[in-house]
């Protein structure tokens, strides 16, 4: 009986040892809600790597989104979307601070901007 119990424990241990321990992570998601004259981010901080930035327009005007890493020159854009619409941007984020702005008319000057922190 002891031999059977030992055999079962050994088989169970071997079965779990063969199972990969690394979890595959998909892209992180950040929803940017556009209102009259503010952005609300679903999260203020994400890990570096693949990300999906979704702009959802709950406002009454058209809005867009321009994303730029502080100290960087590259810009990512979501074109103007109508009220009630949404659009998604897929990108790979490096550590640092990213500024988000609505570049429609004077929206950014009126407060339609936010900051996203990307950590290691």
Region spans (language model):
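Bacterial N-terminal signal peptides
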Residues: 5-15
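Extracellular/periplasmic metallocenter environments
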Residues: 19-25, 29-33, 38, 81-120
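Short loop/turn segments at connectors of secondary-structure elements within structured domains
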Residues: 26, 49, 59-63, 110-112
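Surface-exposed, proline-enriched loop/turn segments that connect beta strands in immunoglobulin-like
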Residues: 40-42, 76
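Beta-strand cores of secreted/periplasmic/IMS beta-sandwich domains, seen most often
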Residues: 42-61, 87-101
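Beta-strand signatures of extracellular beta-sandwich domains
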Residues: 64-68
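Solvent-exposed strand-loop boundary residues in beta-sheet-rich modules
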Residues: 69-71, 108
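Surface-exposed loop/edge segments in extracytoplasmic proteins
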Residues: 72-79
